[in-house]
């Protein structure tokens, strides 16, 4: 492949690790550091980025294509001078999807079996037998957002034996999953969900969507898993729902802000499990392989599956 991949992801100090990752999976690919003083943009350059600084935008506009190491690109499109005419591809690949599915399955099973109670009992040295008779095949899991990751997660849950439904903006069909679409159908979707999983993209339309009113459409005592974005959720409303029994428990991998301040009330709710945005971060080797494959597709004039629709924001 004659194209060159210029790496800015994770900063200057991370480049050697990235170089080794590319060497392991695609030793013939030309890779250089964004921070190399000798680097000057060439017509065949592609950028691998995460959170570029404002001063990077001028050079990004000279790229032939851009690959983001995150599944979300809202932080990029928030830059008013981000080059919207350059192909922008979100992170994907088998490892990214599998990691997300594994995390969600862990979270859903934990909510199903009341694992938070076991952890609290262990901390207190108390032998508390909270027997659970619910099983996966009688538990209804609903996934909000059926994009690349959401669809994969929904089907993974279905294969585990859960009764799975999904909700998205537009009509779709998905094997093993009952699909609802449109805002008019959202309350009906929620009414048949025991554990709600959020994997929506971050857009102005979805930010703050998950509030007390939305959660109130769920059956009393439902569970909630957020692996989308922290700002999808009105966090005070989430705490209210946990405190009054609207929700029996929740697992959050994303919050706002990140890192979560030490004095946040979220840390101290006994029905809430928080993880530090670790649900799905593929190895550098897997991300490098994905970037090489994306660049090869763009060089052939093909359209990658996760090419960003800038107008939609994902």
Tell where the protein language model's regions lie, with residue ranges.
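Short, well-ordered coil/turn residues at beta-beta hairpins
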Residues: 50, 69, 199-202, 227, ...
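Glycine-rich NAD(P)-binding loop of Rossmann-like domains
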Residues: 118-152, 179
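Phosphate/diphosphate ligand-binding glycine-rich loop within oxidoreductases
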Residues: 45-119
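C-terminal helix-to-coil terminal segments
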Residues: 87-103, 117, 258-314
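Short acidic low-complexity segments
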Residues: 31-43, 54-57, 177-193
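NAD(P)-binding Rossmann-fold cofactor-contacting core
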Residues: 160-176
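N-terminal glycine-/charge-rich "phosphate-binding" loop or analogous flexible N-terminal tail
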Residues: 1-45
């Amino acid at each position: 492949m004659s194209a060159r991949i210029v790496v800015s992801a994770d900063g200057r100090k991370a480049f050697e690790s990235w170089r080794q990752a590319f060497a392991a999976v695609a030793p013939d690919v030309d890779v250089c550091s964004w921070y190399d003083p000798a680097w000057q943009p060439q017509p065949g350059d592609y950028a691998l980025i995460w959170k570029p600084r404002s001063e990077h935008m001028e050079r990004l506009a000279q790229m032939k294509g851009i690959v983001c190491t995150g599944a979300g690109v809202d932080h990029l499109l928030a830059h008013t001078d981000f080059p919207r005419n350059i192909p922008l591809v979100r992170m994907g690949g088998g490892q990214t999807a599998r990691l997300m599915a594994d995390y969600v399955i862990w979270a859903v099973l934990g909510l199903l079996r009341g694992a938070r109670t076991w952890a609290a009992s262990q901390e207190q040295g108390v032998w508390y037998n909270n027997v659970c008779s619910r099983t996966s095949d009688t538990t209804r899991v609903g996934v909000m957002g059926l994009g690349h990751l959401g669809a994969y997660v929904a089907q993974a849950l279905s294969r585990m034996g859960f009764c799975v439904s999904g909700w998205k903006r537009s009509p779709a069909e998905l094997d093993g999953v009952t699909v609802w679409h449109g805002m008019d159908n959202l309350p009906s979707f929620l009414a048949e969900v025991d554990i709600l999983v959020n994997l929506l993209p971050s857009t102005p339309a979805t930010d703050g969507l998950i509030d007390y009113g939305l959660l109130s459409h769920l059956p009393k005592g439902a569970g909630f898993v957020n692996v989308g974005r922290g700002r999808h959720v009105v966090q005070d409303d989430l705490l209210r729902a946990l405190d009054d029994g609207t929700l029996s428990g929740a697992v959050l991998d994303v919050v706002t802000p990140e890192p979560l301040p030490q004095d946040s009330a979220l840390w101290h709710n006994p029905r809430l499990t928080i993880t530090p945005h670790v649900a799905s971060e593929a190895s550098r080797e897997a991300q490098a392989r994905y970037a090489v494959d994306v660049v090869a597709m763009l060089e052939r004039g093909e359209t990658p599956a996760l090419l960003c629709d800038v107008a939609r924001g994902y």
